[in-house]
Amino acid sequence: MTDTTVDIAFSPCPNDTFIFHAMLHGLVEKDGLDFRHHMDDIEVLNKKAVLKTFPVTKLSFFAYLKLRKYYEILDAGSALGFGCGPLLICKNPGINLKTAKVSIPGELTTANLLLKLWNPKIKNCVITRFDNILSGVESGEFDAGLIIHESRFVYKDFGLKKIVDLGLWWEQETEIGRAHV
């Protein structure tokens, strides 16, 4: 590594690995820079951002709102879209969300912010690595789970049911989606 080495941190989700693949494997011009990559779960990255561990890092938008004094959003590499927001899922519909044990991908995640805005009475939350939430709900370890990334496309394969699509709820609640239709 050289004195032009930049530490860059992102999650192992497919969006991130796709976004950074060409840069990390020398498939695009890097203008003399070298990159040292660090991959970790989004909640770990959010917490490391609070500590300002990496100069370039993936952040949840919720975490960014708290850290915007120290970080700026790049022109490319951000993943925020319509029809792909977090889902709250369960095995047994009709659970009491006020007392349910809910697995969440992190305290500073945008998914958790949306969950708290949608239902502030949900209090019994357990932070779980995003790729372990589906199996935790399926096994009964958790009553419900807040899923992100590609989990939203496969939760039915685990025999789980959708309680709410928080991305859709947010779009309808704020009418943001109407501006992009």
Provide a role label for each language-model segment.
Residues A76-F82, D165-W169:
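Short, structured secondary-structure boundary patches
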Residues K66-R68, L115, V154-D157:
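Short loop/helix-cap segments at secondary-structure boundaries that form the rim of catalytic
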Residues F130-R178:
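Pocket-lining segment of extracytoplasmic ligand-binding domains
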Residues T109, A179-H180:
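Ser/Thr-glycine-rich phosphate-binding loops at phosphate-binding pockets of nucleotides
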Residues T5-H25, M39, C84-D143, E150:
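Bilobed "Venus flytrap"/periplasmic-binding protein-like clamshell domains
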Residues Y71-D75, K123-N124, G159-I163:
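Active-site regions of enzymes building and remodeling cell-envelope glycoconjugates
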Residues M1-A79, P86, C90, I95, ...:
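N-terminal hydrophobic or amphipathic helices and topogenic motifs
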